[in-house]
Regions:
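Bacterial N-terminal signal peptides that target proteins for export
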Residues: 1-7
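C-terminal motif of bacterial Sec signal peptides marking the signal peptidase cleavage site
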Residues: 17-18
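N-terminal carbohydrate-binding accessory modules
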Residues: 21-83, 98-99, 272-274, 342
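Acidic/histidine-rich helix-loop elements
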Residues: 50-66, 90-101, 234-263
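An active-site-proximal structural segment forming one wall of the substrate-binding cleft
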Residues: 64, 71-80, 97-128, 132-162, ...
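Active-site region of glycoside hydrolase catalytic domains
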Residues: 144-259, 265-290, 311-314
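Aromatic-rich peripheral "rim/lid" segments of glycoside hydrolase catalytic domains that contact
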Residues: 294-347
């Protein structure tokens, strides 16, 4: 069969995002794969979160509706990937078999298509599954059913499309319980995606403090570990409306003193030690500071954290694109040049 005929069959049979002609390893069924998690991690080396859009109860409810031009802007700014927070639990039935709305899958398909059209990589996650955090035992079956559907739906997607099992487990989903749930979710994903890169995070809000309590399944060759970083919290979240008492922190600066830098280094060294012990790459899946902070401090902190991550071969994703922590103002069509220069310094 000619290459042209095979391409036409691919276009007719599956979505555009599943027909990449990029080079790479292939499985027996012809699917391109990336089986080295360090190689996959390099694809998301410099990423941005598409926050406040698809993880809202409904897209647009938190002020962000994704547009095709956003992906073009992200690519042109120098980013290599996006992290896509998604509240799947708001778009699936609450009774068995917990079916995900077809129209919502269509919307995520569109996102994946924009990602690949712009030669970006993406991490798709389950975000803000609040019911699971509050009642893990009652929600476990639904959680696994969501992943079975997501995994099967994207089993033919390009390997640049990665899965992240759950954003920031916390509350009743304890570290011990999370280790159990992530292993079971990973097993479900592997039924249809034996080679796809999967990202796993820490319990207790995804922070570095619980990395030592994270247990990854043995003999799992294609995992990336992710942590989030918002230290010092009173700086990054000063004036955040959803954080009680944060107005009292207004005016907190980050001056880049030796001790401030050392605190970042010490935190990241802890992650490096764990990752080296387990032989896994690291994805700094969220870091950012709220818009009410002093601009110069925001720039200094962002630059130092990004460079500290990069120097340790962490990939990173800034939180986030165009909302309260954002890099881009959709009303003016302008980037926050100070933050962009912090992430992509000239020297």
């Amino acid at each position: 069969m000619s290459a042209r005929k095979m391409l036409l069959i691919c276009i007719a049979a599956v979505p555009h995002w599943a027909c990449s002609q990029s080079t790479g390893d292939q499985t027996n069924d012809g699917l391109r794969t990336i089986t080295d998690p360090f190689e996959a991690n390099a694809l998301i080396a410099k990423s941005v979160n598409l926050g406040n859009a698809l993880e809202a109860p409904a897209e647009g409810e938190w002020g962000v509706t994704l547009k095709a031009e956003y992906f073009e802007l992200i690519k042109s700014a120098g980013f290599t990937g996006v992290r896509v927070p998604i509240r799947w639990s708001a778009h699936a039935r609450i009774d068995p078999p917990f079916t995900v709305d077809g129209s919502f899958f269509d919307r995520i398909d569109w996102v994946v298509e924009q990602v690949r059209n712009n030669d970006l990589a993406a991490v798709l996650n389950i975000h803000h599954y609040d019911e699971l955090f509050a009642q893990p035992a009652e929600q476990k079956t639904r959680f696994l059913a969501l992943w079975r559907q997501i995994a099967e739906h994207y089993q033919n997607a390009d390997p640049e499309i990665m899965f992240e099992i759950l954003n920031e487990p916390h509350d009743q989903l304890t570290p011990q319980l999370w280790n159990q749930y992530l292993a079971e979710a990973l097993s479900v994903i592997r039924e249809s995606n034996p080679h796809r890169t999967v990202v796993v995070g820490t319990a207790e809000w995804g922070g570095i403090g619980s990395v030592d309590r994270l247990e990854v399944p043995p003999n799992e060759p294609n995992l990336i570990v992710t942590v989030h970083y918002y230290n010092p919290f009173q700086f990054t979240h000063q004036g955040a409306e959803w954080v009680e008492g944060s107005d009292a922190w207004l005016g907190t600066t980050w001056d880049g003193t030796t001790s401030e830098q050392q605190a970042v280094d010490d935190d990241f060294s802890r992650v490096v030690s764990w990752a080296n012990e387990h032989g896994l790459p690291v994805f700094l899946g969220e870091f950012g500071s709220y818009r009410t902070a002093d601009p110069d401090s925001r720039h200094r902190w962002t630059k130092y954290v990004a460079q500290a991550a990069g120097s340790r071969n962490f990939s990173w994703a800034y939180w986030e694109f165009c909302a309260g922590f954002g890099l881009y103002d959709p009303d003016t069509g302008e980037w926050n040049t100070g933050l962009i220069q912090a992430l992509f310094p000239v020297n």
